[in-house]
A protein has these predicted regions:
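Ribonuclease/tRNase effector modules and their secretory precursors
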Residues: 1-80
Length: 80
């Protein structure tokens, strides 16, 4: 997966590692939802004990940004 400069900077700021990204991408089931921006999707997943939100291109080739999941996103992910 390609990582934008913006995403790389956010990863560094927020303590999200390339290894954590790999763990999410290797999950058997990745639930994607719509994002506010056209052409992108939102992935919410738990990795290393915390829930994270990844914004990726619809083709899953590029990570646009990453942040800790909001409370409602975390709840959605728990309910599956």
């Amino acid at each position: 997966m390609n990582i934008t400069k913006h995403a790389f900077e956010r990863m560094r700021e927020r303590g999200f590692t390339v290894e954590m990204l790999g763990k999410i991408l290797r999950m058997k089931t990745i639930r994607r939802g719509p994002s506010k921006e056209e052409g992108s999707s939102r992935i919410v997943a738990k990795v290393d004990g915390s829930y994270w939100t990844l914004i990726v291109t619809d083709d899953m080739k590029t990570l646009i940004t990453v942040r800790r999941a909001h409370e409602d996103e975390e709840q959605e992910a728990r309910e599956g």
